[in-house]
UniProtKB/Swiss-Prot annotation:
Protein name: PLASMODESMATA CALLOSE-BINDING PROTEIN 5
Membrane-topology descriptor: Lipid-anchor; GPI-anchor
Organism expressing this protein natively: Arabidopsis thaliana (Mouse-ear cress)
Pfam families per the UniProt record, alphabetical: X8
SMART domains from the UniProt entry: X8
Lipid attachment residues per UniProt (GPI-anchor amidated serine): S157
Molecular functions per Gene Ontology: (1->3)-beta-D-glucan binding; polysaccharide binding
Main location: membrane
Length: 180
């Protein structure tokens, strides 16, 4: 399909207007200091060895002070056939109790943060949204629905990220306009 000159110009103007509007929103967010809140969970990595995970569980439940009751026999997260699942619950508990610091979700590089809720069946993982300075709230969110932006959470937006996204969008739109 070949566009006539007026159609092409109209498309370019539409793209420029959309880009300008997007950059205004990004700039407003950056200047306004708005922070995006996201629910996060600390979970065991898929490629972690079971023996490494078991060692990490033992440390976290002992010296680390994590609440390991739910992974004990009869607990809702106990599954001796799935060490990764049990490690994920313990890692997440430790992470929340330690103020959601990045270092609290490492376990010798066997853990990572995710925004996907790992809860399964009766095994419910509290999220970063329900944590309050390292203490889990009584009404801990289980992350079943949309994130509640009015309470705690982990800020993931910073001015450099917003600037990076805006600049990348501007470059992309400039390339598209140039190649029409």
């Amino acid at each position: 399909m070949i566009m006539s000159l007026p159609q092409c110009s109209h498309l370019r103007l539409s793209i420029l207007a959309a880009t300008a509007a997007m950059l205004m929103v990004i700039t407003t967010a950056q200047i306004g200091g708005q922070v995006i809140q996201v629910e996060l969970w600390c979970v065991a990595k898929n490629n972690a060895e079971d023996s490494s995970l078991q060692t990490a569980i033992e440390w976290a439940c002992g010296q680390g002070g994590a609440d390991c009751g739910p992974i004990q026999q009869g607990g809702p997260c106990n599954d001796p056939t799935d060490v990764q699942k049990m490690a994920s619950f313990v890692f997440n508990n430790y992470y929340l109790k330690n103020g959601e610091e990045d270092e609290a979700c490492n376990f010798n590089n066997n853990a990572a943060l995710t925004s996907l809720n790992p809860s399964q069946g009766t095994c419910k993982y509290p999220s970063s949204k329900g944590a309050n300075n390292g203490r889990l709230a009584d009404d801990t969110s289980m992350g079943a629905g949309q994130a509640d932006m009015s309470r705690g959470g982990r800020p993931i937006s910073s001015s450099w990220m917003v600037t990076f996204i805006g600049f990348g969008s501007l470059l992309t739109m400039t390339w598209i306009i140039h190649h029409l």
